[in-house]
Each structure stands twice: as structure tokens, then as C-alpha cells.
């Protein structure tokens, strides 16, 4: 019987699972939409929703709790300054999971997990900024 077992193991150790979900949470908070497997998306949703609720609290202790969980201070600043105020009047339900077919390599069920009222320009914004910075570095080196 599987009574009392919470979550999935994903054939990973506890530390690997913890870091995997921290990395997924950072990606989701940065891009506001990611594509992952359906079971990972289902387990990621309560983690990120709790982080957004901490962000809505807004005090120093909540900020330190979020930093301890995901370890990326730039994303924590974005969570507290941009994402949490957007959901100030919403009590939970910040994320949606949409099924996205099956992956070709192993036929795994895929899903898109995104914020409900997401900023559509946020997806890939960090990558665009990085590419522009690399472009200016390459131009400066060539000159």
C-alpha cells in the first residue's frame, strides 16, 4: 500500500531531486513558462506556488526562505519585485499546466507549465540579453 507517500522519486536521490526542482523553479520564475515532463510539472507546481506566496509576504524572513530553497538571488529579486505583486489579489492558483503531447525519444508525456497572468515578453529575455552582451563582446574584441 502506498498510503502516506507524498510526491514522486524520479529515480533520483533526495539531494538530486531537491536541486532538480530548485533548477526548474529558477527557470520557471525567470522565463514564466517552461516545457518539462508532466510528472515533473505536477510536482513543481506546489513548490513554486509556495514560493510565490512567500514573495507576497514580502518580508526579510520570507526572502531568506526563498533564497535558501532556490539559491538564486537575481531570480528572488524578480519574484519579490515583479511576480508576487502581480498576484497580490489572487489566493493561490498562480500556475497552469497544459499537456503538450509526447516526446519523440522516449514517448514521455510533456507539459507546459506557466504563470496564469504571465508576461509574454519574459520568455527568453535573459537569453536575448546574454546573446546581445556576447555580441558586443565579440565586436569589441574584433575592433
Curated annotation (Swiss-Prot):
UniProt keyword Ribonucleoprotein, yes or no: yes
A biological-process GO annotation: translation
Region (Disordered): 124-143
Entry GO CC: cytosolic large ribosomal subunit
Keyword Signal: no
Basic and acidic residues composition-biased segments: 124-133
A GO MF term: structural constituent of ribosome
InterPro entries tied to this protein: Ribosomal_bL17, Ribosomal_bL17_CS, Ribosomal_bL17_sf
Assigned keywords, A-Z: Ribonucleoprotein, Ribosomal protein
Any Pfam family: Ribosomal_L17
Gene3D superfamilies for the chain: Ribosomal protein L17
Subunit relationships: Part of the 50S ribosomal subunit. Contacts protein L32.
Record-stated family: Belongs to the bacterial ribosomal protein bL17 family.
Protein name from the UniProt record: Large ribosomal subunit protein bL17
Amino acid at each position: 500500500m502506498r498510503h502516506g507517500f507524498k510526491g514522486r522519486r524520479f529515480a533520483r536521490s533526495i539531494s538530486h531531486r531537491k536541486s532538480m526542482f530548485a533548477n526548474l523553479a529558477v527557470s520557471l520564475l525567470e522565463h514564466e513558462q517552461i516545457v518539462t515532463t508532466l510528472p515533473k510539472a505536477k510536482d513543481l507546481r506546489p513548490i513554486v506556488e509556495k514560493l510565490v506566496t512567500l514573495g507576497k509576504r514580502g518580508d526579510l524572513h520570507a526572502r531568506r526562505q526563498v533564497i535558501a530553497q532556490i539559491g538564486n538571488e537575481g531570480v528572488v529579486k524578480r519574484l519579490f519585485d515583479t511576480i508576487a505583486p502581480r498576484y497580490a489579489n489572487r489566493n493561490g492558483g498562480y500556475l497552469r499546466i497544459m499537456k503538450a503531447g509526447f516526446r519523440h525519444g522516449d514517448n514521455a508525456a510533456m507539459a507546459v507549465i506557466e504563470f496564469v497572468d504571465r508576461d509574454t515578453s519574459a520568455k527568453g529575455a535573459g537569453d536575448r540579453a546574454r546573446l546581445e552582451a556576447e555580441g558586443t563582446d565579440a565586436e569589441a574584441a574584433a575592433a
